[in-house]
Amino acid sequence: MTKIISLTPPQTNLPFPLMRAIKERRTKRKWQDAELPMQDLSNLLWAACGITYEATERTKSRRTAPSSCNSQEISVYVALPEGLYRYDETEHALVGVLDKNLLPNIGTQSMMQSAPVGLIYVSDYRKLTNPVFNNDDRRWYTSAADAAFMSENVYLYCTAAKLATAVLGLVDREGLHKLMGLSEHEKVVYTQVVGKPVDS
């Protein structure tokens, strides 16, 4: 699957107060049986880990969410009904990975059967090159924290955009790892679901 979807530019100037988004942020596990608009998908992916500072000859790029030592080890995969994509934050595009619907597999709860969009946070341990990451425990804790920053950004965007979202910790990581065709250096951290709320 080599399909590439160029996303529309993110709307980075939406007039929603940050403190209000923090106050109103909620986990919502029910959503409409409806597609998520591509503009919302563009916005929430940029919120997760979009580029805010371009790389130079001397420095790496910067993302919307921090990562330890700016390792940028977390990638966001996007599960849609038509297939699995990887978010390329440099090009702000979706890169096709699999022609298969993995939405039912990104969580163990029955609600996943109707999920419109699933985000899968994957850590590439090969990018954790700083000597401080000298064992798998440290690599895992760092990856979990860095993915959490990204998922919280998605939460705040969803609050502002009146979308429903929930992070899923009950994940068959080994099964999902195999279905996605990941390498031994890549680890599924957790997943997140986004959709239109039933009460909107």
What label would you give each PLM region?
Residues 78-80, 123, 196:
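Short, structured patches in soluble enzyme cores that scaffold and shape functional sites
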Residues 87, 129-130:
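Short helix/loop capping segments that flank catalytic or ligand/cofactor-binding pockets
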Residues 175-188:
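Short, electropositive alpha-helical surface patch
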Residues 68, 165-168, 184:
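Short, surface-exposed helix-loop/turn micro-motifs enriched in polar/charged residues
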Residues 113-116, 163, 185-187:
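Short coil/turn connectors at secondary-structure junctions
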Residues 1-115:
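N-terminal amphipathic, basic helical "cap/leader" segment at the start of enzyme domains
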Residues 9-13, 187-200:
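C-terminal helix-cap and adjacent tail motif
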